[in-house]
């Protein structure tokens, strides 16, 4: 299982890189769960990241505005992100979500077919009125994405496991794999919860708070020693 760590700036990116993270995921926590950062921050982090190491960019907890989202996704692609990650926050149905993601996939793949498009849903979708998390694999499949992902929308200390049982998460992973895609799971995941994700076959685990001082995704800063501890668990 590989580790995605979400820095908000270049200083944190260096900590994640030196800690051994597999994917450097550019994020802007004040703007939400999958808050989008600025194009120049993506460019700076891409420049700071070694060749061969993948850079991801969150495009935001997006609303049902396919044109706006597609343009933002293309901006992240041109800025150097390898993974383009869309949080389906304001899409209320399968059809709306597919509409957004299909257009994103078309824009990103037209620019560079090797880029990886991630459809991200929310385990706590019921709290914000987002699309059902358990249909994210079908949405990703039907819109030409490469990865189906789950996170949590509300960052209040509750984790992925507070909203979905391990059995449902296992079904999510298995369905994603059945469609030939990779599965990523995140959502205020604690270090001690990571082995459960490995056990159910998750491909990518995404963290920020667990790698930050005081476990605080907003006020804390990513530390390489904390990243190293998590990398060790992922690779055991």
UniProtKB/Swiss-Prot annotation:
EC number: 4.2.3.153
Active site, per annotation: 27 (schiff-base intermediate with substrate), 85 (proton acceptor)
Domain of life: Archaea
Pfam families xref list: 4HFCP_synth
Enzyme class: lyase
Keyword Lyase: yes
Similarity comment: family membership: Belongs to the MfnB family.
Entry protein name: (5-formylfuran-3-yl)methyl phosphate synthase
Organism for this UniProt entry: Methanococcus vannielii (strain ATCC 35089 / DSM 1224 / JCM 13029 / OCM 148 / SB)
């Amino acid at each position: 299982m590989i580790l995605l760590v979400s820095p908000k700036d270049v200083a944190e990116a260096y900590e994640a890189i030196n800690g051994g993270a597999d994917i450097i995921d550019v994020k802007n926590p004040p703007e939400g769960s999958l808050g989008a950062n600025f194009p120049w921050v993506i460019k700076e982090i891409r420049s700071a990241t070694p060749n061969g190491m993948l850079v991801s960019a969150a495009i935001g907890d997006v609303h049902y505005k396919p044109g706006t989202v597609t343009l933002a996704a293309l901006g992240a692609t041109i800025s150097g992100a390898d993974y383009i990650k869309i949080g389906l926050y304001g899409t209320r149905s399968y059809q709306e979500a597919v509409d957004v993601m299909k257009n994103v996939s078309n824009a990103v793949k037209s620019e560079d077919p090797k880029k990886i498009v991630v459809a991200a849903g929310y385990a706590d979708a019921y709290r914000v009125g987002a699309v059902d998390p358990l249909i994210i694999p079908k949405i990703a499949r039907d819109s030409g994405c490469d990865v189906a992902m789950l996170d949590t929308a509300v960052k209040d200390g509750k984790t992925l496991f507070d909203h979905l049982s391990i059995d449902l998460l296992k079904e999510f992973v298995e369905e994603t794999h059945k469609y030939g895609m990779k599965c990523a799971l995140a959502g205020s995941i604690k270090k001690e919860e990571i082995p459960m994700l490995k056990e159910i076959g998750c491909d990518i685990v995404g963290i920020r708070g667990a790698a930050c001082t005081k476990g605080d995704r907003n006020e804390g800063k990513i530390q390489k020693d904390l990243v190293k501890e998590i990398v060790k668990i992922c690779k055991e």
